[in-house]
Amino acid sequence: MKNFAFIFARGGSKRIKNKNLQKIGQESLLEITLKQAQKIKNIHKIFLSTDSKKIAAAAKKHDIEIIMRPKNLSRDKSSEWFAWQHAIKHVNKKFKFDKFICLPVTSPLRSKIDIENCIKELNNNYDIVITIQETNRNPWFNMVKIGNKKRMEIINKSINKTIDTRHRAPKVYDMTTVCYVAVPNYILENKSIFSGRVGAIMVPQQRALDIDTPFDLKLARLLYPKT
């Protein structure tokens, strides 16, 4: 059984310039992710999908295969699902593989066990496995939106009873960007993660940080040496 890891890193980033090449400690986010993938024994090959020559050059030092991504799949509003499909089609021209493993560059605090647990969990009759964490917010209890006449209202009103405590609300979780593992054909034949059988691995909050803002980057730099 062949397991291939894919790292997707665009050159453009609105909130943090050159985000994927920002350093946490002595290494860039890209380098950290590449080394995390290389430490997993049952990952047999690693690919980088990017539209950036600068990112590609940085990755080549680590002896991985580069997939140059078309510009139409690299815009701010481009769905990464289509980038996944593009990468799988590219690899399928040369190799056949059984598990697609995506390691987003923006989650440098992940551990080896998080990745290994996701790879194993796919064997339990799932099409794709995601990672989740406990959340402090709940759309039935303390998350609101602006409704008619700019009045605030609870996001989800589908339950026909008043929920006045967090414990009475349905249990919900945050999706994280720690790791995704899927059957390659599932990605090729569907349009989104939740089109089929979705499994999940719980990740503790301290390993689930997703770097999206300058504040997230500062927090990662504080936490990284301690993980």
Regions found by a protein language model. Name each.
Residues K2-S49:
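N-terminal glycine-rich phosphate-binding loop and ensuing alpha1 helix
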Residues I43, F95-F97, N125-D127:
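Short, high-confidence coil segments that cap the C-terminus of an alpha-helix
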Residues F47, K53-F100, L109-I113, N117:
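Short phosphate-binding loop-to-helix
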Residues L48-T50, V181, I211:
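Short beta-strand scaffold positions
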Residues F82, H86, P108-R197, M202-V203:
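Conserved core of the sugar-phosphate nucleotidyltransferase
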Residues L103:
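Catalytic metal- and UDP-sugar-binding loop of GT-A-like glycosyltransferases, i.e.
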Residues A200-M202, Q206-T227:
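Hydrophobic helical membrane-anchoring modules
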